[in-house]
Design a protein with these regions (language model features):
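A short helix-loop-beta-strand connector motif used in the catalytic cores of GNAT acetyltransferases and
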Residues: 55-69
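Acyl-donor (CoA/ACP) binding surface of acyl/acetyltransferases
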Residues: 1-35, 69-198
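Polar/charged alpha-helical tracts
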Residues: 16, 46, 58-59, 158
Length: 198
């Protein structure tokens, strides 16, 4: 299925549409929200429309995808996003407007999308976070994801070196982790970052 609507206690997870463009722009233009993401903040509504067409509208034409707007039930206004890429990594990603941080909104959305992925027989999901983005790691742990390893990557288009932590959850009851998820990486074993083992 392609992004079937999901309901949680507080949220509706649904497809983005063109009526969301102003809220979409608010999400993807905020420097803090997009600090740890692989794109630059959007500059105007025209960029938002192009970004929406490229990353959402086009994939809604596919047979199976998970590309959600996170909305409150009370007003159905989009306040964030949550996606699963269906490449080899099955990478889970999310973002939320900063005024809604620290309310466990993303955790609620993650729980729902994991349940949907399991229902549709995805065997596993992975997720990564910049080592500096501690709160994203907390979301992954709370969702039952297990830390696998850390790696360093030269990140484009921002042209910076980033240390990532990779997590995985197996949805098929099997143990172990996916060793090759199709990225060029240097595994970092028993290294430290600011005194902490990564």
């Amino acid at each position: 299925m392609n992004t079937p609507t999901l309901n949680t206690r507080r949220l509706i997870l649904r497809k983005f549409n063109e009526n969301d463009l102003e809220a979409f722009y608010d999400i993807f233009s905020d420097k803090e929200v997009n600090q740890f993401l692989p794109w630059f903040p959007l500059k105007n509504l025209d960029e938002a429309k192009s970004f929406y067409q490229e990353r959402y509208a086009s994939i809604y034409q596919k047979k199976q995808r998970y590309a959600y707007a996170i909305c409150f039930k009370k007003n159905n206004t989009s306040i964030g996003y949550i996606n699963i890429d269906l490449d080899e990594s099955h990478d889970l990603g999310y973002g939320l407007k900063k005024e809604y941080w620290h309310q466990e909104i993303v955790s609620e959305a993650v729980k729902s999308i994991i349940q949907q992925a399991q229902k549709e027989e995805l065997n596993y999901l992975t997720a990564t976070h910049d080592i500096k983005n501690i709160h994203s790691g907390h979301v992954m742990k709370k969702a039952g994801m297990n830390y696998c390893y850390s790696y360093k990557e030269h990140w484009m288009p921002k042209n910076i070196q980033v240390i990532f932590r990779m997590y995985q959850i197996n949805l098929d009851g099997k143990n172990g982790f996916i060793k090759n998820i199709g990225i060029n990486m240097n595994i970092l074993l028993k290294k430290t970052y600011k005194g902490q083992v990564i």
